[in-house]
Amino acid sequence: MIARLAGRIILLNGWRRALAAFLSGAFATLTQPPFDIFVAGFVSFPVLVWLIDGAIARTDAGPLRRLLLAAKVGWWFGFGYFVSGLWWIGTALLVDADQFAWALPLAVLGLPAFLALFYAFAAMIARLLWSDGLGRILAFAFGFALAEWLRTFIFTGFPWNLIGYAAMPVPLLMQSVAVIGLVGMSALAVFVFAAPALLTGGHFARTGIGLAIFLALAHVGFGAWTLSRAPAIVDENGPLAVRIVQPSIAQAMKWDNAERRAIFDKLVGLTEEAPAEGKPRPDVIVWPETAIPYILESTPQALAHIGDALQEGQVLLAGAVREEKGADGGEPRYYNSIYTIDDRGRIVSTADKVHLVPFGEYLPFESFLRGLGLQEVVEMPGGFTAGTTRHALAVKDGRSFLPLICYEAIFPDELGYEGAGASAIINVTNDAWYGDTPGPYQHFRQAQVRAVEQGLPLIRAANNGLSAIVDTYGRITGSLALDAVGVVDSYLPSPRDPFWGRPPGWIQTVLILLTLLAASVGLILYSRRRFH
């Protein structure tokens, strides 16, 4: 039955092959949040393998033509995957549809079309190393792992919905990322998902199926072993109590001058709210990204109001736009920042967002694109300016938090050595742009995995959710649902040392890629000697 199905898929040609690849990619989206149907990967990836088998089997095409046919299959798979997984980005443009609706096709179709090029590249690389049976599955895993790694930094990077997340729907299955990293998880996921393609036979097919089963069991077993040694989820004697404020301000209200006071009062009111019975008095209070609707340096009354709201010894970490006056009356610069404010209403420190969102917070190639009207996409005059370095924010009692603002949390190993000595990751964000769509759930999952990857607990304050405190095993110690209004009160979990310490992330990635490459090439050479 499987052989018959595979044969039919392999024989598809032209638009039928493209449609099958597109639908297979779209089906693979079910492996990502909020669906987390990881078994969908065992359908979509074998189909992709068979489609590439069909492209390679063309006897009427030369080597270059077959390579391009494989790339075309990969592109259609990627286009289906990214269209179905990222369509919600377009909802941000509908908040002010009169001004931004024109850009909807670029967001919903243009971005997926560009990102699909990475999967076209993955298919091309796999084709270069393709061999019968197990060899093509290894080549497949290598090609996709390499493409996913490139997606983390090419053109500033956009590693959203990396395939590795499909293998980590729950904390039990997140623990391996601390050992092999997110690129390693992507390679593992692709290899295991694609392994059913070996049920049709081929060189070392049984070995490949056995290896996939072993890797899957090792992945689960390592997670179970790690969690069995983990401390209690909530430490009732924790050294630091944290409150996250989630105001759920509608995006249309955020920059309405008439609503600024109401927004600010809502934040202050939630800050002053007494803890529920059994919950600790907070030492640190966190507001979401750009929560403060004022420029603090020029609004001393707002700082005074914050100081009055904080109890003795409390510290507020709040997202706000920071203005830096231009020299000699020049244009000011604006930063997306986190402020640390003490109980006297004094600004203790600030941290600026380093990794800005292209076309959302700044305009790449501005001089070239200004004539196209894209400058209007950026809210602040001239857009945001990127911070120069990421540094820890001193909080209290010698503890410090590493700031990740908004989508900085999607980048694996974004912290690097800077995480050394920090007590936690603080991630402030505003996902109200995207409403009740898959976007906020996908964003949260990626931040959740950062806690496991870096060995640091996560404090995540989101304007409309999902706000949560996550321990270093990926377990949620307190949270608020999407669009809820309220606070999360919980003790801060303890950090733990990352599995490999804190070497540069690329070292781990390169070792994994070289291992896969060596295995693929070695299997090709061995097969040629034995079977030819």
UniProtKB/Swiss-Prot annotation:
Pathway note: Protein modification; lipoprotein biosynthesis (N-acyl transfer)
SUPFAM superfamilies (UniProt xref): Carbon-nitrogen hydrolase
TM region(s), chain numbering: 37-57, 75-95, 106-126, 128-148, 179-199, 207-227, 505-525
GO molecular function: N-acyltransferase activity
Location(s) in or outside the cell: Cell inner membrane
Protein keywords: Acyltransferase, Cell inner membrane, Cell membrane, Membrane, Transferase, Transmembrane, Transmembrane helix
GO biological process, one term: lipoprotein biosynthetic process
Active-site residue numbers: E289, K353, C406
Membrane association type: Multi-pass membrane protein
Disulfide bond entries: none
Domain CN hydrolase: 245-494
CDD domains per record: ALP_N-acyl_transferase (cd07571)
EC category: transferase
One of the record's GO cellular component terms: plasma membrane
Family under the similarity heading: Belongs to the CN hydrolase family. Apolipoprotein N-acyltransferase subfamily.
Protein name: Apolipoprotein N-acyltransferase
Lineage, broadest ranks: Bacteria, Pseudomonadati, Pseudomonadota, Alphaproteobacteria, Hyphomicrobiales
